[in-house]
Amino acid sequence: REDYLPAARELLSSIGEAHSAFNSTLILRERGVNAVFVDLSGWRDQDTDSMEETISGHLAGLDFASCMPIVTGYAKCKEGVMAKFDRGYSEITFSKLAVVTGAREGIIHKEFHLSTGDPKLIGADKVRTIGHTNYDIADQLADMAMEAIHPKASKAMELAGIPIRVANAFDPGNPGTLISRDYVAPTPRVDMICGRRDVLAIEVFDPEMVGEPGYDYNVLASFAKNKISYIAKNTNANTITHFVSEKSKNLDKCLKELKEHFHGAQISTREVAIVSVIGTNMKLPGFLHRAAKALAESKINVLALDQCIRQVNMQFIIDREDFETAQKALHRELVEHEQI
């Protein structure tokens, strides 16, 4: 059963994408658009090339100035796009298309705007659309499970210097958010308050850790073996805490291995949430103070705190019951007050 499932997923994805692209082409032609169906699904191809070769071969001879290519989101390739990228495969194809064709800009249509906060939680009248940000911030959002585009897709476009515009399909008059490589807000500000509540803290406490080279390396070896990526991390003299998604596969297996390997350590877990304050230009004294003060005034205890020297993301680890209150408090202090 496990042997044929990957191939079946690839086949089903290719059929669905080909059907959608073909119908879209016919609809556009009926409306006077010179649309051209470009089928990358490869269902008739005997040979399998790399994705770049597949795209280049199928686009060869097309004059983009006189026609509109309607391309399948699925592209047959040696590496198996569904197996490698799962449900984000269409954004990988999108990215490769942009790079191969030397696009001026890539536009992704979502069902939402990239906003300063969750409008359903904070209120549509209190949030604003983020007009411009950079790829660094897009990475931070992906870690919060809020990816505007698949991280592996954005990397290819970032390296090629191609900006991405995230537009709301239900608000066509709004230019949306432009994500470019080097943008930094002209004045210090917070761009977004966001977070995730599906976080598990894995704490390793061991008095023998003090001054012991490679201790953390051995902890991470188990994470790597079980393909578990961490979102945030705290350390002190005798404690290392990694914050991971509780939905991570092999989590129980990883915890069992840690307990077997570190006999003298106390290994514990705790369900937590992370709320992030993100911005391209926050290198100003006072942002952290204001954020911590806003949480304290809302009676929220900060369990842990992370911020790298580059100062684009402050992560507050809190109890899950405070998740929504924390976002409202931080948005009110760091975004809404700045707009007054």
Which role fits each region the language model picked out?
Residues 1-149, 154, 317-319, 338:
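Nucleotide/pyrophosphate-binding catalytic subdomain
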Residues 11-14, 23-30, 96-100, 137-140, ...:
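Alpha-helical scaffold segments in soluble metabolic enzymes
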Residues 33, 103-104, 162, 228, ...:
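Short glycine/serine/threonine/alanine-rich loop segments
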Residues 40-43, 74-75, 110-121, 169-172, ...:
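Short, ordered loop/turn segments at secondary-structure junctions
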Residues 65-66, 160, 226, 298:
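Structured helix-beta-strand junction loops
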Residues 134-209:
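A conserved active-site cap/scaffold subdomain adjacent to cofactor or substrate pockets
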Residues 175-340:
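A conserved regulatory-domain signal marking ACT and ACT-like small-molecule sensing domains
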